[in-house]
Structures are given as structure tokens and as C-alpha cells.
Amino acid sequence: MPTTFQEIPRERPVTPLLDRADTPAGLRRLAEADLEHLADELRQELLYTVGQTGGHFGAGLGVIELTIALHYVFDTPDDRLVWDVGHQAYPHKILTGRRNRMLSLRQKDGIAAFPRRSESEYDTFGVGHSSTSISAALGMAIAARLQNSARKSIAVIGDGALTAGMAFEALNHAQEVNADMLVILNDNDMSISRNVGGLSNYLAKILSSRTYASMREGSKKVLSRLPGAWEIARRTEEYAKGMLVPGTLFEELGWNYIGPIDGHDLPTMIATLRNMRDLKGPQFLHVVTKKGKGFAPAEIDPIGYHAITKLEPADKPAAPKKASGPKYSAVFGQWLCDMAAADNRLVGITPAMKEGSDLVAFSERYPERYFDVAIAEQHAVTLAAGMACEGSKPVVAIYSTFLQRAYDQLIHDVAVQNLDVLFAIDRAGLVGEDGPTHAGSYDLSYLRCIPGMLVMTPSDENELRKMLSTGHLYNGPAAVRYPRGTGPNAPISGDLEPLEIGKGVIRRQGEKVALLVFGVQLAEALQVAEQINATVVDMRFVKPLDEALVLELAGSHALLVTLEENAIMGGAGAAVGEFLASQAVIKPLLHLGLPDIYVEHAKPAQMLAECGLDAAGIEASVKARMAKLGL
């Protein structure tokens, strides 16, 4: 196996066993003795594929053996296999007939980064966000029972995703309906237990065997007539298992817990899965894997190698780097540290996005004021509300797509009480190769309808810094939404001064056409304006809208064009139209933004072009409307 990033194979490896196992049916025709060799080949194939395309990396390497075992033991796709999040699903895709399409992974018109129902019958449930798998698999298990079907339902969930409340809601419900289903905990961080080894593997085989299960069920029937005796027996079994395994919590929730077992020991996993396949009721298997297994750098640094960029040809000349500014997330991270130094009331909260949201430096400088709540967006928002009640100034750093999961808390716990909580909303707009499940397409629409909410859209790095200060000093809930990637390299002021709330600024004076920009399309708008002599306005605030400026522009221009990287429906442009209608002002409007579709994965520039939000698309749309109006 390669030991450095540059040693990842650039040519497809020779894989005679994998060539015969490109579908689960082919896999099941292999001898069990061949499967460990198959695992080696699949791991090499995954290294090669992701090296060519880039993408999620470490999680897939860690579940090679588990993926093989699941498809070997269960009759997929008839048996329903649900992967949580989907970061670990690349080996699954390779083994389910998509090997020859893997080089199109995450590319325009190629296969998706996550399981998609429309892509394969083996992808039984579309994912991207975490902690949904148990609920989905439970729904499938109940449906199978109602249809008198014997098909199995299996959910594979990671230890990180198991921190979310939704997962425990499903675990609790499954025992209530006594669902025949299997949950597999893929523990790749050892956050639950380190008790893995020969004794644990041996115990798992015993506890999952039909003999043990039949004895257990027989005893239950007899002792159920003697409630006191049954409760003593149940507790005795639970405590005996608890001395060797960490499953007491799951047993208390009504699940038959097995494990932990070594997730890279194929014979043990296959034997255990075969034993558990026909057991009735909720079954829980705990497997321990190593993220990045088989690639030393990823084993050492699983966070850094969570995803990788594609390998470039060794002889490819270095392309000249385009001038660009810092990442917007880095600007936020620096502001957070600066404001924390100036205001000791500030606290930082994130739902498991420390690195992505650039909170590393803040967490190191102010550990007592930093709170990573894990994958628990609802809790993160209400935690912030509680802190704000006591005089703290919480900053919730969260991706736009994940804030959707805490919308009730945003309204009920923060906004209704008019609490001082600042939402730093990263990854707003289109995010590229991860596709529609990760796009921040709706935040302006779902934020601007909330009374008292301050909503801001920076056009560059300096505007972001000023808006963060504005939101921090605002008396009430505030949101600043900014995109993934780098800014246009605008000079950044070192101060912490706020903006005047609700005031936009004219960046270029033109005539006839006014381009009202909400966010980072300002550079494209200025470029287009040079071709048509348009006025360009950096609106800055979606809420409160600069109504005086909108009226002024409507009175002096023949066409108003709104620009935003948000859904057109209910977005910033809609706010302009609603205001003009409320004032009985009739004015031609053109709203440019994200259409009423899910924009599929591609490079960000390709996605913007598809939506007509690049300079060429904006210019074409505006000129077409001008021609229609005779301008």
C-alpha cells in the first residue's frame, strides 16, 4: 500500500477478483477464502479512483471489509442497505455495478458523491446529511412487515452521526414497534469503547448465534409469566454483557447488542452477520474500524484525509495561480479571535464543524469559550439561546444546509425571545461537487420571513468582517451568510466597526438599468455593467431592506435586476418585489438567482453557468430583458 499522497496509483491496479465481483451477485459467487484478497484489491481500486477524481477518502478506506461482508451475507438490493451520510459509500458504489463510472465521481453529469436513489437500485435511500439512516431503515422495516415481506433492513451509522438526537429517536421507536432490523455502528474513532479483541469477537459470535437466541427467547416466554423472575434474569444478562461490552445503553433501549468486533476481521464479521440475519426484533452490531485503513497518512491524520483533491500528473506544468483573497471561512475565524479579545462575552459554538468553519485558532486561544456540540444542530441553537439569556454573546458557526435542521429552534428559542445570537452561515449558495444535499440554497428565503431577524450578504472579505461586527453588536438575532471558497482579495480593515444597519451602497452609477446585488455576485455585476452602462448597488442587507434606496432606484431606472445565489422563490429579489408592490410602484423587475430545481453536482463555475449567474449568463439575461422592454 502507498505511504504518501504522491504514491497513490495513477493507473488502475490489476484486480482479478474485483473484476469478477463488480455486482453483489458476482461477489457472492466468490469463495469466502478469497474475500480478504478482494478487500486488498478494493482498497487499491478506491485509492486509484479517488486519486483521479478527489473526494471523500478516509471513511471509505475504513469500511472496505464491512462493505464486502454486508453484500456477501445479505441479498442486496432486495435486502435494504442504508448508509448514513454517505461519505463511506464509495466501496459500495464500486461493488454495485458502478466501477466503470467512478472516474466521473462528483463531476458534472457523473455519479454523485453520496448514495442516490435515482442512480442505482442498491442506493435504497438518498443521504448527505447525518443521522438519518436508522429512521429510514426503520421505516423500510415497518413497510416490509405491512407488506408481509421477509426482506431485511440494515442501517450503517458512524459513531459521530450517533451523537445526533434523531438517531436516538429512531432507536427508541424501533424497540417500541419491535422492528426486525439491524443497526451497525461503524465506530471509527473509538469514542464509545476500546474493548476490541479476541474475547470480544468470541463473545459476539456466541451472543449472535441462533442457539443463544432461541435459549434467550425460550427463557423469556417462561419467565414472562413470573415478572419478578424475568426482570432479575434480564438484568443479570445485561450486567454480564456489560462487564465485557459497552452495550448497556442500547440494551436499555430494547436492542440486542452484539460487539464490539473488529471491523477488519472478515471471517468474524461474516459469521456474526450470518447469525444476526435471521434474529427477530431490533439488533445492534458494534464494529470498530480504522478510518483511512491501508493508507498510512490517512490513518495518522483521519481529519486531514477525510477528503482529498485529485492527483495531478507528475509532469504537468504548474498553472499560474489566479489572484484571490483568503477563504471567507478564514476571514470569519480571524474576526472571531479578534472580537473575542475585545469582548469577553463572546462564545463560539459549532456542530462538529471546527475545521470546516475555521474555528481551530479560536478553540486553541479560548478553549473555555469554545463549544463543539457534535452533530447536534438543534441543541447548538438552543444552547446559544440559553447562553444569550444570561448575557453571553454566542456566535453559532454553521453551514447553511445544516442550519435547516434547527429551524424551529431558530424561531422558537432565539427569534421569538429576541435573543442576541449571531449566526455565521458558511457554505451559502452552491458548493460544487457535493451537490444539492450540501448546497446552501434557501437560507435567505427562510431567514428573511422571521420577525426581528437581521440578515446580511457580504460581497467581499472586508464586507464580511464588518457584517460580523454588525451582527455581534445588534440587539437581537442576526445572520451573515457567506460562500465557500475565496474572496476577490479586497483590502481587509483591522477594526471591528459595524455598518449602518439597513443601508446599501452604490458601487457604480449608470443609467436605465440598476443591478441590485445581494452577495458575492458583485464582481460579475460590475463586469456586466461596463457592457451596458448599468448602475450597480451592493445591497448588503436583505433584512431590513434599504427601502429608500430601492424607491430611489425605481424612480430613476427603467429596469431593476436583483442578483443572489439563493433560491429565487422567497429570496432577496422577492423582498424587493414585495416592497415595491406594497408601495404601489409598478416597475419592470428581473430576478436572477437559483432556479426551482436541485442543481446537480459539478464544479462551482459550471453550476453558476448552468444557473445563469456567471458574468456571461447575467449579461445575456439582462440584455434579453432590455430588448423586450425596448431599452
Curated annotation (Swiss-Prot):
Task: Give coiled-coil spans as residue ranges.
Answer: none
Quote the record's cofactor note: Binds 1 Mg(2+) ion per subunit. Binds 1 thiamine pyrophosphate per subunit.
Q: Which PROSITE patterns match?
A: TRANSKETOLASE_2
Which biological process terms from the Gene Ontology are attached to this UniProt entry? 1-deoxy-D-xylulose 5-phosphate biosynthetic process; isopentenyl diphosphate biosynthetic process, methylerythritol 4-phosphate pathway; terpenoid biosynthetic process; thiamine biosynthetic process
InterPro entries, per database record: Dxylulose-5-P_synthase, THDP-binding, Transketo_C/PFOR_II, Transketolase-like_Pyr-bd, Transketolase_BS, Transketolase_C
Cofactors required: Mg(2+); thiamine diphosphate
Keyword Metal-binding attributed:
yes
Q: What biological function has been recorded for the protein in this entry? A: Catalyzes the acyloin condensation reaction between C atoms 2 and 3 of pyruvate and glyceraldehyde 3-phosphate to yield 1-deoxy-D-xylulose-5-phosphate (DXP).
Provide this UniProt record's keywords sorted from A to Z. Answer: Isoprene biosynthesis, Magnesium, Metal-binding, Thiamine biosynthesis, Thiamine pyrophosphate, Transferase
Gene Ontology CC annotation, any one: cytosol
UniProt-listed Pfam families: DXP_synthase_N, Transket_pyr, Transketolase_C
Q: Where does Mg(2+) bind?
A: 159, 188
Q: What is its EC number?
A: 2.2.1.7
Query: Which reaction is catalysed here?
Result: D-glyceraldehyde 3-phosphate + pyruvate + H(+) = 1-deoxy-D-xylulose 5-phosphate + CO2
Record organism: Pseudomonas putida (strain W619)
Task: Please give the CDD domains that the UniProt record associates with this protein.
Answer: TPP_DXS (cd02007), TPP_PYR_DXS_TK_like (cd07033)
Q: Has the keyword Magnesium been applied to this entry?
A: yes
Q: In which pathway does it act?
A: Metabolic intermediate biosynthesis; 1-deoxy-D-xylulose 5-phosphate biosynthesis; 1-deoxy-D-xylulose 5-phosphate from D-glyceraldehyde 3-phosphate and pyruvate: step 1/1
For the ligand (thiamine diphosphate), the binding residues are 87, 128-130, 160-161, 188, 295, 377
Q: Which family does it belong to?
A: Belongs to the transketolase family. DXPS subfamily.
UniProt lineage: Bacteria, Pseudomonadati, Pseudomonadota, Gammaproteobacteria, Pseudomonadales
Protein name per its UniProtKB record: 1-deoxy-D-xylulose-5-phosphate synthase
For molecular function, the Gene Ontology terms on record are: 1-deoxy-D-xylulose-5-phosphate synthase activity; magnesium ion binding; thiamine pyrophosphate binding
